[in-house]
């Protein structure tokens, strides 16, 4: 009422450092960005993905080959600078885990950048969000926001016992849940695997009636769509692939050191947080480093003189694979997970 921001704790934090638009923060960020694009009249080409970067004869990034995924038409986009902002890799489903990511999260930017000559950092590290929905199957892997635990929900095993502090760092929390379900055999059988309870009714025991609807309405709606009232019933959760710690190497300007004029922003960047991160810190990838990449790419574009376009780096990459004795039938970038084509 007095205009003070509501803040809460996140996993691993010693201070309240999380502020949210209820539990619609991601949607609010997307709405604001889309409004800005529309208001400024920035052209957007829907259903069209980059399938190869284009370099010029001097080895600078100079555009991309695009694929219209509706018509199959291929287009060439010329550019003085290029920004990769393709997000994560959860839809690769590493080690068979579910994911909270959108369907386009197939590490395409990493593939394109690496093939063009950019270096990768920490590509072997991914963050599992401790609480992905484990039941019902229709929302398997969907994010159950950290805010649920911040408001007081506890993680409980099949014996009804709290087995860990609810706001440990994400790696510790995810490992604890997996251990409870495997090594200790204290998970709950969901019909498609094991999970643990997240005691959501505790939120209203602590905060009073109406807290869930006021603070996490998206969670309430998601489960109510499947007949589960989280105000009265606990929910089943299990770790879900959430964030790609690794990515493409950049300098302080957001540009890849090995490929001039190629910039990276967002989750496709590697090394900003090292091999792990706290909740909320991923926003630095876009708000701080994304803004820097955009500004620097614009300044550099103003002084870049276009040169002849080539795809020579693709032939060089194929030659390197052959020289290393690597044979593969893999097609990349994937654009969408394999099961979308079945």
Language model features: what each stretch is:
Residues 36-44, 54-59, 69-78, 136-137, ...:
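Solvent-exposed alpha-helices and their adjacent loops that cap or buttress functional pockets
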Residues 112, 118-229, 233, 296-302:
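An anion/pyrophosphate-binding glycine-rich loop and adjacent beta-alpha core
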Residues 1-8, 12-16, 56-57, 156-167, ...:
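Glycine- and aromatic-enriched mobile tails/lids
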Residues 81-138, 142, 280-296:
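Glycine-rich loop(s) and the adjacent beta-strand/alpha-helix scaffold that form part
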Residues 1-73, 78-80, 85-86, 93, ...:
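Conserved redox-cofactor binding core of oxidoreductases
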Residues 22-30, 75, 102-106, 144, ...:
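Generic structural signal for well-ordered, non-membrane alpha-helical segments
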Residues 51-61, 65-67, 215-269:
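A glycine-rich dinucleotide-binding beta-alpha-beta segment and adjacent secondary-structure elements
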Residues 1-2, 44-47, 120-124, 192-193, ...:
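Flexible, glycine/charged-enriched surface loops at secondary-structure junctions
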């Amino acid at each position: 009422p007095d205009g003070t921001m509501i803040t809460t704790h996140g996993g691993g934090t010693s201070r309240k450092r999380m502020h949210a638009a209820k539990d619609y923060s991601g949607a609010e960020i997307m709405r604001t960005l889309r409004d800005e694009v529309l208001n400024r009249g920035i052209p957007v080409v829907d259903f069209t993905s980059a399938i190869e970067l284009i370099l010029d004869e001097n080895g600078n990034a100079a555009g991309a080959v695009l694929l219209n995924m509706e018509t199959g038409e291929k287009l060439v986009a010329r550019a003085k600078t290029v920004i990769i902002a393709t997000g994560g890799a959860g839809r690769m489903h590493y080690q068979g885990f579910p994911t909270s990511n959108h369907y386009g999260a197939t590490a395409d930017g990493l593939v394109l950048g690496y093939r063009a000559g950019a270096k990768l950092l920490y590509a072997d590290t991914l963050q599992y969000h401790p609480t992905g929905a484990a039941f019902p199957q229709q929302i398997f892997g969907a994010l159950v926001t950290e805010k649920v635990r911040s408001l007081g929900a506890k993680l409980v095993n099949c014996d009804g016992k709290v087995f860990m502090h609810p706001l440990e760092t994400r790696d510790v929390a995810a490992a604890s849940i997996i251990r409870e379900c495997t090594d200790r055999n204290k998970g709950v059988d969901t019909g498609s695997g094991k999970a643990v309870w997240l005691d959501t009714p505790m939120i209203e025991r602590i905060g009073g009636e109406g807290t869930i609807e006021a603070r996490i309405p998206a969670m309430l709606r998601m489960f109510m769509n499947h007949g589960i009232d989280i105000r009265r019933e606990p929910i089943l959760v299990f770790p879900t692939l959430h964030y790609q710690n690794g990515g493409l190497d950049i300098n302080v300007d957001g540009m890849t050191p090995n490929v001039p004029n190629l910039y990276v922003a967002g989750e496709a960047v590697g090394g900003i947080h090292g091999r792990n991160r706290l909740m909320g810190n991923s926003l630095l990838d876009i708000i701080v480093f994304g803004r820097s990449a955009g500004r620097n790419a614009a300044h550099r574009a103003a002084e870049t003189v276009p040169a002849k376009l080539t795809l020579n780096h693709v032939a060089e990459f194929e030659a390197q694979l052959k020289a290393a004795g690597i044979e593969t039938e893999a097609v990349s970038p994937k654009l969408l997970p394999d099961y979308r084509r079945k």
